[in-house]
Amino acid sequence: MSIKFEITKQNNIHFEIAAVAAALVGYFTSASWWVILLFAAVYFGLVNVKLELPVKLSWLWAAILLVIGAILSVFSVQYVLLTDEDFVKTTDMVCVVNVVLALAIYLVILFITNNTRLTCTIASIAILAFGFIDYFVYEFRGNEFTYADLKSAGTGLSVVTKYKFVIDYKFLYVILAAVLYIMLVRRIEVQFESAIHMRIISILLTIICVLYVIMNSMSLNTETWEKKGTYRNGYLLNFVLGIRDSFVKAPDGYSKAAVDKIAGNFKETDSSYSQSDAKNPTIIVIMNESFADLSVVGDFETNTQVTPFMDSLSENTLKGYALSSVYGAKTPNSEWEFETGNSMAFLPDGSVVYQQYINDDPTSIVSNLKNIGYTTVAMHPYYATGWSRNKVYPHLGYDETYFIDDFDQTKILREYITDQELYDKIIDRYEKKSDDEKLYIMGVTMQNHGGYGERYDNFNQEVYKVGASYTDANQYLSLLNESDKALENLITYFKGVDDPVEIVFFGDHQPGLCNDFIKLLNGKGNSGLTEQELENLYKVPFFIWTNYETDAQKVDVTSLNYLSTLTLERANIDLPAYNRFLAELMEKIPAINSRGYYSKKNECFMHVEDATGDEAKWIKAYNILQYNSMFDEKDRSSLLFPYLK
């Protein structure tokens, strides 16, 4: 090994340029001056030193440089993307997996270039740039850059110039660190005796790294809400998990012929939308955030009835419980199941359809009603970018969309716009409709969103559990009581109108409450549950009410994917072909979600893969049709899944 230290005019020029650039950037980003001075000192030392290492130990020096680069790359990306609070949430194991993943990237580039300097330079810049892209994408739309975004990169680039982005001192720090790392690499001479041996070792180590990442990420889910993916999985790994979950395998027995065979049983002999007896009611759908009846988990007593009005509904009402596919979070999956009739049962755990699988115009109750002349409206009193609704709603076929800026933001309970404000907006839109306008409105509330641990001056807690006190549960129950009052106002208004109106109401999922409270209800909490006990955590109440005469019915259990079919049936609108399939499926498989299905034959909840006989055949047919609708663009059934007209 030889170390040479030589101060030259050219090196001094390089140093001066780097120091001035760092100082200027530091001035505009309010970075600490001691960081700038430290950078200048280290850079001065590196720019004037040259290390020549023994050829026989080249593999060792290369390994050290690559490992340092991988660690620095992962640390830099996490540091830029996360707040200090979120940064420390990432576990050591997750950090190790991300470093190994980054090392695999370095090794692949080394295999291609056979040059350690070039490899470290390219890999470190590429990974850091990748992190910067995610930072700007998050600032632009409120969620992270994922593999699915590559399909719509052109759209993003077309509007990105219209936005102003602000960078802070973190950018400078990681850039300075990257510059020092690259300078270190450039000052070290690493030569390999055999390029072939180096490439063989590189590919073998890459395989080992990839296998390690796979083995340690099999139980992890892609996270797509805000920056959960970065602090729970690490950004690099979360991006790779998104790639994994973007490719859904075709079910066994899938083919165009299999789809056509199933579809053949639901061919239309006349117009699918013959409405000679239809009332063409105004259809209002309310998906209420975290609205649940916790008594399905276990009995408990409160000081007053939580939802007295909803409990009293019976006349002209179909009501009961439906299985959601999510618990405590990931609202859009419930929204999607209702709208399309499809199920999370056949998609990867943790996936979010709105952000991963909607790239064209899926058939839904929205598109079906739009095709028969309905004006379709979506309302959500929160940010348009939440769960990518601003991109998804046009695909679904909504004519009008209303988000947080369209509501009175003084009507707040805790931190969110109230149910009553949303319902007032729905009533206002109804009153503005023309006499011959057929109207469909989907309202997604925000009032009851978790968490429930903070105290608020604008919220009076009126409902509480008798006995042991649980702060979050009491706040949640009080919120439900407020929702019930707003619901009563909505129903009362539409009882008084002459036009036919149908109101569909359901919760998206149960709330995420403390495990001690859940344990009080079911004796176990959230773990060690039987299939029946587990499904109880996924039950949400629903009803379909009309202001005209319909049969009063109770449903013990169904699932959200069937509610749009029930909505059309209660409106006396002829069912499209896919909904007719779902209506028959509902007779065989009364409820199905991401956790399993209800077996009529065995009178219990079971895992989908444990289905046998006729139940297995119907579930398989459902899986085949759903795959056709979501992933087979070339041979998608035009009978079952027509595009918007």
Positions of predicted regions on the chain:
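Transmembrane and membrane-interface helices of multi-pass
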Residues: 2-231
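A diffuse structural propensity rather than consistent per-protein peaks
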Residues: 8, 136-146, 168, 255-256, ...
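Short alpha-helical interface patches
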Residues: 10, 141, 149-161, 169-173, ...
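Generic structural signal of hydrophobic/aromatic residues within well-ordered alpha-helices
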Residues: 42, 76-77, 156, 239, ...
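Residues that form generic nucleotide/phosphate-binding pockets
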Residues: 132, 159, 187, 242, ...
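Alpha-helix initiation and N-capping motif
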Residues: 150-153, 233-236, 240, 307, ...
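Membrane-interface segments at or immediately adjacent to transmembrane helices
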Residues: 215-285
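Solvent-exposed soluble domains appended to multi-pass membrane proteins
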Residues: 270-278, 285-288, 293-645
